[in-house]
């Protein structure tokens, strides 16, 4: 039997590819022969001929499919496609997302509905992997993958001699054949080359904007892009865009990792070839030849948190039976609570785990299976190219924290990366690329806006203010700026009210019409004050802007409670004003129709009962019109 299927992944950060490759390798263990393909290379005309097709994709922006998938998605949206186009095709969809976003897995949901509408038959439920889960996306990925395999085995039964019990102990082949020059007799000097997808910006300013003794270190970063011409076209950006920064691992941890695995820094990797090109792609973000040192410093995400598959694969490379048993337990269904306590809560990285299993003997080629590449980190740009055409500004929080159990002190990878430049002035190249976000100013500067950006969430709104300042200074009529309300939040007025002079100057100049700052630790009697309290105090003004003047409402900042609380405050404002309008209408009707009191009272009760549905419909309309926009992380 020809046991084939096609797995299509659509990725921007690399996560979808990683998940799709793991799924492909798992299917091979069950005698299924998947064809793995990047959606960029997929011929859309093949889709109606697929017997079984599996999509793995994330959601980007405000509910859009990833950029590489847009040509295929636009093709699928053609209205003239017959309703039976995929009559012979079964499909499965796994979405990777973050439930802190209102558009959680929208791309997967839309694709699922569209494939059904043109005749496709779903193999199983849509998978919705959530990065906010205690176990991250792994929880749903593992669960959904097993359901998928069970469904596929009803279509492609196992051969009679197949022993399913062997799968548990079976080691997958490594992804790559790797050629290494371990001798380097000629002492070749291999210079690390930044991947071709990135511009080489130069660090120009790295300035702390919180007071020195304050617990939070927030930095104003300026990157010089005046000489960025690597991609044949000059680098360009707009207000609201996102800069992706490719960081490096700390030198101390790099040397520790190399010593831990018995490698040598000057070994040279000359070639990396996929063993099975049907299920493995060549590594991206990697230019060869490369030394072991640069591979570990610039490619492997050794400071990242291991996923479940890492523990499963590592169990094959320990010689100590007790260590092996522990790793097997961590990778089992029964061991997930213990794994969460050991790994996710303590934020262990790959080095931490490897040090705790000293009997490891890892074949070098399996490192690419065990440790993923460093992913570029996104930062909202906090400048406007109209005012700063040769620089990009970032507002970066140096992320340091202690873990809940062992109280280990941690610093995020990109935080360490930017911090390292303080003492390393000779190596100030920062690899970046720019991506458009879903947050844009209205087309007309006269349309009013409401901006809510506590902490480093203010970055995108600083870029908005700079753009408004440019138009005010370069306009024939200085009075054409619409209202702009800015709600900023921080902990202390004297410690972390960054960009204070700039924001207050913008208020004086009329760039913004209202500035409300909530200091969560400066409240009277120890009471905390948050931005949503100021928003609710401005209920009438916000309603006027949203309802009567077609204004825009933006939220930017850390995911978690803040975006949810601010959204709830907006919903409360919408509800109270809709009720107020409804009551006013009923009162007018009562005055004009004194003989119909009973009917009016009944209508009033019905409206009050349906108010939540009315509010939700109103809010959904704001989202559809892209007048309610969130940028959270």
From Swiss-Prot:
The keyword Membrane does not apply. Residues 580-610 are annotated as: Disordered. It catalyses: 2 oxidized [2Fe-2S]-[protein] + NADPH = 2 reduced [2Fe-2S]-[protein] + NADP(+) + H(+). It comes from the Eukaryota. Gene3D superfamilies: 3.40.50.360, NADPH-cytochrome p450 Reductase, Chain A, domain 3, Nucleotide-binding domain of ferredoxin-NADP reductase (FNR) module, Translation factors. GO terms for cellular component: cytoplasm; cytosol. It is found in: Cytoplasm. GO terms for molecular function: flavin adenine dinucleotide binding; FMN binding; NADP binding; NADPH-hemoprotein reductase activity; oxidoreductase activity. NADPH-dependent reductase which is a central component of the cytosolic iron-sulfur (Fe-S) protein assembly (CIA) machinery. Transfers electrons from NADPH via its FAD and FMN prosthetic groups to the [2Fe-2S] cluster of the anamorsin/DRE2 homolog, another key component of the CIA machinery. In turn, this reduced cluster provides electrons for assembly of cytosolic iron-sulfur cluster proteins. Belongs to the NADPH-dependent diflavin oxidoreductase NDOR1 family. In the N-terminal section; belongs to the flavodoxin family. HAMAP family: NDOR1. This is NADPH-dependent diflavin oxidoreductase 1.
């Amino acid at each position: 039997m020809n046991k084939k299927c096609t797995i299509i992944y659509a990725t921007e950060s690399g996560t979808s590819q990683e998940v799709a490759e793991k799924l492909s390798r798992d299917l091979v263990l069950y005698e299924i022969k998947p064809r793995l393909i990047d959606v960029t290379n997929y011929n859309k005309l093949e889709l109606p001929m697929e017997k079984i097709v599996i999509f793995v994709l994330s959601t980007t922006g405000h509910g859009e499919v990833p950029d590489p998938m847009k040509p295929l998605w636009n093709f699928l949206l053609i209205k003239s496609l017959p309703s039976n186009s995929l009559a012979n095709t079964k499909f499965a969809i796994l979405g990777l997302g973050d439930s802190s976003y209102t558009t959680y897995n929208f791309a997967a949901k839309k694709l699922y509905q569209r494939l059904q509408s043109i005749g496709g038959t779903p193999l199983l439920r849509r998978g919705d992997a959530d990065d906010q889960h205690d176990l991250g996306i792994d929880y749903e990925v593992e669960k959904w993958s097993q359901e998928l395999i069970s469904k596929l085995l009803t279509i492609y039964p196992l051969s009679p001699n197949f022993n399913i019990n062997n799968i548990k102990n079976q080691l997958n082949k490594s992804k790559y054949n790797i050629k290494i020059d371990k001798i380097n007799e000629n002492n070749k000097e291999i210079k690390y080359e930044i991947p071709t997808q990135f511009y080489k910006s130069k660090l120009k300013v790295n300035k702390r904007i919180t007071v020195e003794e304050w617990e939070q270190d927030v930095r104003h970063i300026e990157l010089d892009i005046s000489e960025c011409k690597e991609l044949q076209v000059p680098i360009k950006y707009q207000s609201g865009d996102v800069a992706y920064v490719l960081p490096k691992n700390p030198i101390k941890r790099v040397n520790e990792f190399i010593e831990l695995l018995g490698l040598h820094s000057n070994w040279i990797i000359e070639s990396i070839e996929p063993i099975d090109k049907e299920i493995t792609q060549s590594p991206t973000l990697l230019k060869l030849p490369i030394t072991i040192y640069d591979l570990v410093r610039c490619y492997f995400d050794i400071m990242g948190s291991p996923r479940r598959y890492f523990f499963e694969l590592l169990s094959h490379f320990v010689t100590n039976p007790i260590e092996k048993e522990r790793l097997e337990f961590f990778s089992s269904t029964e061991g997930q609570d213990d794994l969460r306590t050991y790994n996710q809560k303590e934020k262990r990285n790959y080095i931490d785990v490897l040090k705790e299993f000293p009997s490891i003997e890892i074949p070098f080629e399996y490192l690419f299976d065990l440790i993923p590449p460093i992913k570029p980190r996104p930062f909202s740009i906090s400048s406007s190219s109209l005012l700063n055409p040769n620089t990009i500004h970032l507002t970066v929080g140096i992320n340091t924290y202690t873990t809940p159990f062992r109280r280990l002190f941690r610093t995020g990878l990109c935080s360490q990366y930017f911090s390292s430049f303080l003492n390393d002035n000779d190596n100030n190249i920062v690899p970046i690329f720019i991506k458009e976000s879903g947050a844009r100013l209205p087309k007309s500067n006269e349309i009013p806006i409401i901006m809510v950006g506590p902490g480093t969430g203010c970055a995108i709104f600083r870029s908005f203010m700079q753009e408004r300042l440019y138009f005010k200074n370069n306009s024939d009529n200085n009075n054409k700026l619409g209202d702009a309300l800015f709600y900023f939040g921080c902990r202390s007025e004297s410690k972390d009210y960054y960009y204070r002079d700039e924001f207050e100057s913008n208020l004086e100049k009329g760039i913004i019409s209202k500035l409300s700052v909530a200091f969560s630790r400066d409240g009277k009697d120890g009471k905390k004050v948050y931005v949503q309290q100021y928003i609710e105090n401005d209920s009438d003004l916000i309603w006027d802007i949203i309802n009567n003047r077609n204004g825009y409402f933006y939220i930017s900042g850390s995911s978690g409670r803040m975006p949810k609380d601010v959204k709830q405050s907006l919903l409360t404002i919408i509800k109270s004003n809709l009720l107020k309008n409804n009551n006013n209408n009923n009162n007018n009707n009562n005055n004009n129709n004194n003989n119909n009191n009973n009917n009016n009272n009944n209508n009033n009760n019905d409206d009050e009962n349906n108010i939540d549905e009315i509010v939700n419909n109103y809010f959904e309309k704001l989202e559809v019109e892209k007048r309610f926009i969130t940028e959270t992380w």
